[in-house]
Amino acid sequence: TTASGGHLWLSVIGFFGVTSFLSMWMSNTSTTAMMLPIAIALVGKEYPRMRAYVVLGTAYAANIGGLATAVGSPPNGIAVSALDIDFFTWFKVGFPSAIMMFPLVILAMWVVIRPEKNAMVNQPGGNNNFSMEWNAHAKGSVALFIFTVFCWIFSSQIGHFLGLKQFDRMIAIFITALAPILGLISWKDLEKKIEWGILILFGGGLCLSVILSETGTSKWLATQMIQTIAGSPDWVVIIASITLMIFLTELASNTGSAAILIPVMMALSNQFNPAITYALVFGVGVAATCAFMLPV
């Protein structure tokens, strides 16, 4: 709110932008949980529609940001694993997708909710501006974050230079171990604050994907689908698959849905038309995070 000069719309759009950016590097669930208290404090109860706009927008902005990178949302990781691509290959498609979706979702919410035009933004902490001590720990954390992003974006080049495969996976483990060694966080805090449930869910999703592929279940399901869509153009297959994933994730876990459908889509594209593999799996992977309609 300080950077926006107290201007309501600049504050709100800026807040959504920060939420999306954080969600590129954190799980969208964690980002939403962290930003919601700030969103609630941003607009008073006397403006209920604007408050609803900001609170819902925070959740949507976190979902949109999660599309941009391979680490932003578990379905992205499942798609990356299935396609055997690196961080930057996903980023080249995911980031533009997130950039295009951001204004569309913000505008659609405004049309539906119609927030009060005279709403005022609250200044957190009253007249006292928020300030953070820019100490060695803060500087070290920012430096480590920039280093991690750099290594992820250029993972292919660095991995080729070092002769290492899947370097983007290795850098994540390396940074996790390096942070407590440098004293930026204690091992106890790391153990307590890591969302182990999400990691287990993600790992379980990858295991389920492998099981479906290795047992031939995904190929059998793909064969049944091909019999239904035989003779359809490629674009019809892609749009139908994306639509199926969007509606499935309205009722089921996006990670679980991605773990089940992505191996099927891989098998489907290999049998139907291998040329559409990347477009189909990218589309389905992105669609898994687009569960905007229902609270579940």
Predicted segment positions?
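Hydrophobic transmembrane alpha-helices of multi-pass small-molecule transporters
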Residues: 1, 89-223
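Membrane interface segments of multi-pass transport proteins and intramembrane proteases
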Residues: 2-9, 162, 221-232
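Hydrophobic transmembrane alpha-helices that form the pore/transport pathway of multi-pass ion
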Residues: 5-67, 74-83, 254-287
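Transmembrane alpha-helical segments of multi-pass membrane transport proteins and ion-pumping complexes
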Residues: 7, 11, 20, 24-33, ...
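Hydrophobic alpha-helical transmembrane segments
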Residues: 9-17, 31, 55-56, 91-99, ...
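Alpha-helical transmembrane segments of multipass membrane proteins
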Residues: 20-21, 42, 149-153, 177-181, ...
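Membrane-helix interface "capping/anchor" motifs
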Residues: 45-49, 184-193, 249-257
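C-terminal transmembrane helix pair
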Residues: 88-101, 204-208, 229-296
